């Protein structure tokens, strides 16, 4: 009898161990939830430069897309579209690209995007969405909502729980407000949604911040730009929220949506803020400022990887003071390679890496009108 009981207990333990093998959460797989309306859904034209993506950046497919050969609930390389089958470029695209470009190679980034063009923030209210959905008259909007089983909030939570089996949720990205322009209760409504997400997914606000982007800015003629005043009040309601500026992010002819270049820049700004929240305050790769004069360039150093000396080429269109600094991956300055005026034209700077430890380093070129950074790999 004792032997039989022992065998049964042993069998139960082995069965439990085997059943748990399919659940393998990777702490180095950082997952970000994205939601909002059309600008987060993505309306930008996907161009050739957008179709090449680092394999460390992935998307959890939200809906079945035979046109993309993607199945709901599976991870894929994050080649746009990242939302639905026929959506376009969104801020999430260059958010993820910039994150993987600046984080260690051991870190992967995953995106879940459940966004609905034209919707009010009320669509994501856990309890109140039914009243809002019942008031909708536009067939196209009803059809989009139907793709998320009539409940985008619940759909996002279900997808997030699925993703939590694979990785760790590190943040929430929101871009919404055009359909709520003038609504002073918007910050309070967003706060409820944020708190509901934290509770339903067992998350803590101090480790899962909310990043909310401004709508098309007044400096681009944005027709909903007045909403940015309200959006910027969000941190007063949610201390762990951050507002991403849309100033100088270029837009489409409708002055409502960003164009592809605007989405790229806005996505990079989301990433820059997220990296800062994570404690990375050094120079960032792939976040060159928008106001770039013609013929400014910072090229890849050669050779790269490097063990001894390496050459860094750059070009400036006019005579100007140039700073060219090398930083370690923690953001500490290693050396200034320029620090003087240069005439217009092509130039090079030489850097001796013999005394440095192996790893990833960043070099940054700064002038009055340009900032650019690139990675350098040192191997011994």
What are these regions (language model features)?
Residues 1-26, 287:
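Bacterial Sec-dependent N-terminal signal peptides
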Residues 4-5, 231, 380:
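Generic extreme N-terminus detector
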Residues 5, 18, 34, 371-372, ...:
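Short alpha-helical segments used as structural interaction elements across diverse proteins
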Residues 7-10, 19, 224, 314, ...:
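Disordered, low-complexity tails and leader-like regions
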Residues 17, 25, 104, 165, ...:
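Generic structural signal for beta-strand residues in well-ordered domains
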Residues 25-284:
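Cell-envelope and extracellular/periplasmic
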Residues 289-302, 306-380:
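C-terminal outer-membrane/trafficking sorting elements
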């Amino acid at each position: 009898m004792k032997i039989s009981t022992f065998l049964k207990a042993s069998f139960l333990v082995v069965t439990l161990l085997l059943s748990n093998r399919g659940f393998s959460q990777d702490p180095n797989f950082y997952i970000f939830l994205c939601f909002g309306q059309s600008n987060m859904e993505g309306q930008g034209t996907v161009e050739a430069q957008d179709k090449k993506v680092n394999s460390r950046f992935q998307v959890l497919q939200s809906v079945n897309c035979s046109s993309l050969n993607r199945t709901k609930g599976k991870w894929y390389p994050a080649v746009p579209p990242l939302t639905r089958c026929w959506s376009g470029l969104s801020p999430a695209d260059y958010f993820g690209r910039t994150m993987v470009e600046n984080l260690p190679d051991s870190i992967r980034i995953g995106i879940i995007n459940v966004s609905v063009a034209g919707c009010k923030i009320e669509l994501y209210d856990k309890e109140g969405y039914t009243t809002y959905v019942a008031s909708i008259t536009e067939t196209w909007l009803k059809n989009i909502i139907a793709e998320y089983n009539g409940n985008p909030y619940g759909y996002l939570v279900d997808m997030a729980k699925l993703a939590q089996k694979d990785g760790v949720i590190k943040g929430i990205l929101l871009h919404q407000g055009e359909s709520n322009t003038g609504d002073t209760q918007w910050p309070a409504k967003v706060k409820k949604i944020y708190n509901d997400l934290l509770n339903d997914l067992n998350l803590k606000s101090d480790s899962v911040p909310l990043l909310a982007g401004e709508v098309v800015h007044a400096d681009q003629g944005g027709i909903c730009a007045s909403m940015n005043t309200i959006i910027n009040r969000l941190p007063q309601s949610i201390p762990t929220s951050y507002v991403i500026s849309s100033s100088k992010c270029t837009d489409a002819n409708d002055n409502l949506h960003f164009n592809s270049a605007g989405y790229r820049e806005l996505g990079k700004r989301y990433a820059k803020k997220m990296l800062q929240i994570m404690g990375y305050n050094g120079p960032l790769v792939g976040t060159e400022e928008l106001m770039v004069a013609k013929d400014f360039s910072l090229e890849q150093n050669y050779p790269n990887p490097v063990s001894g000396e390496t050459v860094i080429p750059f070009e400036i269109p006019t005579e100007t003071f140039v700073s060219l600094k090398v930083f370690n991956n923690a953001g500490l300055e290693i050396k200034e390679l320029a620090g003087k005026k240069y005439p217009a034209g092509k130039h090079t700077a030489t850097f001796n890496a013999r005394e440095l430890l192996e790893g990833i380093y960043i070099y940054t070129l700064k002038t009055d009108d340009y900032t650019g950074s690139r990675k350098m790999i040192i191997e011994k």
